[in-house]
UniProtKB/Swiss-Prot annotation:
It comes from Arabidopsis thaliana (Mouse-ear cress). It is found in: Nucleus. Interacts with CDKA-1. Interacts with SAMBA. Induction: Repressed by MYB88 and MYB124 in newly formed guard cells. Its main location: nucleus. The gene is CYCA2-3. Keywords: Cell cycle, Cell division, Cyclin, Nucleus. This is Cyclin-A2-3. The keyword Hydrolase does not apply.
Length: 450
C-alpha cells in the first residue's frame, strides 16, 4: 500500500531529486556490503593452507624438496646436538664389539693351543669322567696347522702365497678340487678334517687301563670279544663304522669302570646296539642281540647296561676312528693314479681292522693307525716306488719318520708273528669280494723308507 501510494503521488522536481539521492545511498550501501564480505572470503582462502599443514604425511610424500628444506631450517640446531652424541655412542659401540671379538679369538686360540700341547702323561680316576676331555699324545705329534680352505679370504691366501717359505713346500695334488660330488664336501673338507684331528685328541682311553683298572678282564678276553663282534657285524651286514665305534665304546667304558668277565659279552652287544643306532639306517633289535648270545642275557639286562653306558658317555657317542681318517688318506694316496686300485683300498682296510683286536694299538692315535695302514698297503703292493709322497705328507701331516714304530707294529700283525689264533678278520678279507688281500704279505721294511 505504501508503494502504490508513493507511485500515485504527483511527480514533481522535489520528488525526482529525492529519488536520485536515495538511489545513490542504496548503491553505496550495497558496495559497502560487498566490501565487508570480501575480506571474509580472503581470510577464508588465506587460512586454507594452514588447514593443509595438518596432513603432514601427504606433504612429505608429494613435496620432498620443500619439506626437506623446512626440516633442515627448523631442526638445524637439534641435528648438530644429536650428531655429537651419536658419534660418541657409535665409537663406544665399535670399541665394545672389537674388544668382544678380540676376547673370543684369544679364548679360541688358547683352547686350540691347550689341545695341541697336551701330553700323554695323564692320570685316571676310577669311575669318573674327569679325563674325558684330556688327550693322549704318545707320538708327541703336533696339531696340523689350520687349513686355508676354499672359503678362506683372498688376503689370507695371498699372504701365504707371498711368504718366503712357499717355494720350499713340495708340490702335492689337490684332492679337494672336485666340486662335482656333493658327498665329498670339497668346499669344507679341510676344515672338517682339521676339527677331526682336534677331536681325536679328546676322550682317548689310556693304553694301560687293563693293568690299572680291570682285574677280572684281560687283554686276551678283549681280543676274543672283538673277534666275535666282527663275526656278528658280518652276520647282520653292519657297516665298518659301526664295528669301529663299537670297539671304541667298549674300550672307553672299560677305561673308567670295573667290569666282571661275566658281563663282558653283555657290554659288547650293548655297545654294538648303541653304535648301530648311531651309524645304521636300520639297527638290529635288542632281541636279535640277545639271540646271538644264546639268550644268555635278557632284554632288561641289555637295557640296563645301555643306560649305564650312555650315562658314562654323557650321551656323547661319536668320536673319529681310524676308519674316519682312512677314507681321506686313501684318496690322497691314489690322487695321482688314473684309476684307483681296489687292492690298495681293501688291503689298507684289512690292516686297519686288524688293529682293533690288538690292545697295544691303543697307544697310537687313530690318524696314525690310518696313515700307517696306507703306508704298509702301498709298500705291499709296490716296492719299486716309495710308499710316501708329498700329497700324503700334506694331508696326513705325518712324515715317514713319524710312522716308523706304528708301521713296524702293523707289519707284525699282518705277518702274524705272534701266532694270534683269532682269525675272524683274516677269514673275512680272504673272500673274493675283498680281492683276497688277507693272503698278501709284505717284504721287509727298509730303514731307508723312514
Amino acid at each position: 500500500m505504501g508503494k502504490e501510494n508513493a507511485v500515485s503521488r504527483p511527480f514533481t522536481r522535489s520528488l525526482a531529486s529525492a529519488l536520485r539521492a536515495s538511489e545513490v545511498t542504496s548503491t553505496t550501501q550495497n558496495q559497502q556490503r560487498v566490501n565487508t564480505k570480501r575480506p571474509a572470503l580472503e581470510d577464508t582462502r588465506a587460512t586454507g593452507p594452514n588447514k593443509r599443514k595438518k596432513r603432514a604425511v601427504l606433504g612429505e610424500i608429494t613435496n620432498v624438496n620443500s619439506n626437506t628444506a623446512i626440516l633442515e631450517a627448523k631442526n638445524s640446531k637439534q641435528i648438530k646436538k644429536g650428531r655429537g652424541h651419536g658419534l660418541a655412542s657409535t665409537s663406544q659401540l665399535a670399541t665394545s664389539v672389537t674388544s668382544e671379538v678380540t676376547d673370543l679369538q684369544s679364548r679360541t686360540d688358547a683352547k686350540v693351543e691347550v689341545a695341541s700341547n697336551t701330553a700323554g702323561n695323564l692320570s685316571v680316576s676310577k669311575g669318573t669322567d674327569n679325563t674325558a676331555d684330556n688327550c693322549i699324545e704318545i707320538w708327541n705329534s703336533r696339531l696340523p696347522p689350520r687349513p686355508l680352505g676354499r672359503s678362506a679370504s683372498t688376503a689370507e691366501k695371498s699372504a701365504v702365497i707371498g711368504s718366503s717359505t712357499v717355494p720350499d713346500i713340495p708340490k702335492f695334488v689337490d684332492i679337494d678340487s672336485d666340486d662335482k660330488d656333493p658327498l665329498l664336501c670339497c668346499l669344507y673338507a679341510p676344515e672338517i678334517h682339521y676339527n677331526l684331528r682336534v677331536s681325536e685328541l679328546k676322550r682317548r682311553p689310556l693304553p694301560d687301563f687293563m693293568e690299572r683298572i680291570q682285574k677280572d678282564v684281560t687283554q686276551s678276553m678283549r681280543g676274543i670279544l672283538v673277534d666275535w663282534l666282527v663275526e656278528v657285524s658280518e652276520e647282520y651286514t653292519l657297516a665298518s663304522d659301526t664295528l669301529y665305534l663299537t670297539v671304541y665304546l667298549i674300550d672307553w667304558f672299560l677305561h673308567g669302570n670295573y667290569v666282571q668277565r661275566q658281563q663282558l659279552q653283555l657290554l659288547g652287544i650293548t655297545c654294538m646296539l648303541i653304535a648301530s643306532k648311531y651309524e645304521e639306517i636300520s639297527a638290529p633289535r635288542i632281541e636279535e642281540f640277545c639271540f646271538i648270545t644264546d639268550n644268555t642275557y635278557t632284554r632288561d639286562q641289555v637295557l640296563e647296561m645301555e643306560n649305564q653306558v650312555l650315562k658314562h658317555f654323557s650321551f656323547q657317542i661319536y668320536t673319529p676312528t681310524p676308519k674316519t681318517f682312512l677314507r681321506r688318506f686313501l684318496r690322497a694316496a691314489q690322487a695321482s693314479r688314473l684309476s684307483p686300485s681296489l687292492e690298495v683300498e681293501f688291503l689298507a682296510s684289512y690292516l686297519t681292522e686288524l688293529t682293533l683286536i690288538d690292545y697295544h694299538f691303543l697307544k697310537f692315535l687313530p690318524s696314525v693307525v690310518a696313515a700307517s695302514a696306507v703306508f704298509l698297503a702301498k709298500w705291499t703292493m709296490d716296492q719299486s716306488n716309495h710308499p710316501w709322497n708329498p700329497t700324503l705328507e700334506h694331508y696326513t701331516t705325518y712324515k715317514a719318520s713319524d710312522l716308523k714304530a706304528s708301521v713296524h707294529a702293523l707289519q707284525d700283525l699282518q705277518l702274524n708273528t705272534k701266532g694270534c689264533p683269532l682269525s675272524a678278520i683274516r677269514m673275512k678279507y680272504r673272500q673274493e669280494k675283498y680281492k683276497s688281500v688277507a693272503v698278501l704279505t709284505s717284504p721287509k721294511l727298509l730303514d731307508t723308507l723312514f
